[in-house]
Amino acid sequence: MRARCGRILSDSERVEADMDTGMGGMDFGTVDAVAGQVAGNLAVSEATIADLGYLRAQLAAAEVPFLLVRDRDHRLVLAADAAHRAMVRRVTAAAAAAGFVCTQPQPDVVRLGRDRDPAHHVELELWEYHGDTVECPRPNALTRTVFDLADVEFTEVRLFDRSWPTLAQMFAPQPTDVGFDIDIVFSWVDGSDPEFRARRAGMMAQVVVGEGDDADARIRQIDELKYALRSVHKNAPWIRRIFIATDSPAPAWLAEHPKVTIVRAIDHFSDTSGLPTFNSHAVESQLQHIEGLSEHFLYSNDDMFFARPVRPSMFFTPAGISRFIEADVRIGPGRNNERRSGYENAARVNRALLAERFGHVITRHLEHTPVPLRRSVLREMEEEFAADFARTRTSRFRAATDISVTNSLYHYYALLTGRAVPQEAARVAYVDTTSRAGLAVLDDIAAHRDLDFFCLNDGSFPEISESERVREVSRFLAGYFPDPAPWERVSAPSRRPLPESTAGAA
């Protein structure tokens, strides 16, 4: 029997998952540990790892030699020797009987998985060995579709606490791999907390706010944060740490976990004289002062979700250049004034600052997605626009003179100073969940799963009742992200409901 495409596990190896002997005269004595940056760029979820382990055991039991391969999109592939085609069919049939969904995207390629999202399934290829050459159904990270056997070296790679047969350099760091740590910061507020609502209402009565900025939509929450964090765990597992910037009590479902940290404003505002704040613009102007935050990080709101597996290169180049996503929506003419929303005003303040500094006029908003930032650039901006940062930092509510650092001041400043570029590869959707048209697209998003990100925004001028919105959004999120993250409590009290909103009310 040939063993060109890998080797067979012994009975003890199937139990221990420890592949440290050779077979068929092939030397698998070298075990290369996958560098952290390579493992991160693979963006492999727990669901995928579990299915890889299952298929590995089944192939070993069927005595089918195989290799672990990284494809051109950094997806993991099991490459089996086509001489064992009949046994591979038995393995896939057994997987289907065990609950795997099996599809065949092209000849000699089978996709298998138990997750409802095919992006987390494992692909199994059949490689043909013709004397001194090997033919693959597709190119991969290392080889073309046809290569000489003499040009490759068989080895093992340590990945997911196991050793896997592979080809030398298959998992070596590549110039396009992002090799630095990336954290994420979420801003969040529990609008159902009675103490918070009373304090906010009392202080808001003393100020003038823009259109829609006093609406409950600014603070409503139906556990979106729980699902946003689930989306990180599943679709961006390379993120090192999660910070939640909030002065609300920790959500009941959140347990102590080394990867998740609650950050209070008093601990990261450079000047605390303006606290408490109810202004997300103020919070966003102080992210660079969060202790322990990585140089490169993402910022997100609790209504933004990672919809499918994404790699670090979605946000940064290997050189650390950030990649941001412009929206088709134009900022529009006119200056900031108290009649506009805080969102629209901040875009105009940003535009004026950048025009004065660089002589360029920005015209577009950014998409509602997680955005990449660098602490060093933020600190530089805080010095460059010191008065604007200070004014926004001390603004308790959104004001007509606020800057919006994360949308879009940072990104265009970084672009105009050579530290950012726009990108058009991401597929995104913005959904107003208080509109009937918005709710109507949720099932399509779940069915197609072809987006990288989606935002489920809570509009300030609803067409539907709050109870209907809560029911439909909760149903959608529970179906899209059903698997708890490791930082969730086994059971937690239900959230406190907000007072019912009347359709059409602000």
Swiss-Prot record:
E.C. designation(s): 2.7.-.-
GO molecular-function term, one example from the UniProt record: transferase activity, transferring phosphorus-containing groups
Domain of life: Bacteria
Keywords: Exopolysaccharide synthesis, Transferase
InterPro entries: Stealth (IPR047141), Stealth_CR1 (IPR031358), Stealth_CR2 (IPR021520), Stealth_CR3 (IPR031357), Stealth_CR4 (IPR031356)
Protein's GO biological process: polysaccharide biosynthetic process
Pfam family, one: Stealth_CR2
Annotated region described as Disordered, given as residue ranges: 484-506
Regions crossing the membrane: none
Note: Stealth proteins are part of a protein family that is conserved from bacteria to higher eukaryotes. Family members were first identified in microbes as proteins that help pathogens to elude the host innate immune system. Microbial stealth proteins are involved in the biosynthesis of exopolysaccharides. Stealth proteins are predicted to function as hexose-1-phosphoryltransferases.
Protein family membership: Belongs to the stealth family.
Protein's recorded name: Exopolysaccharide phosphotransferase NFA_48680
Native source species: Nocardia farcinica (strain IFM 10152)
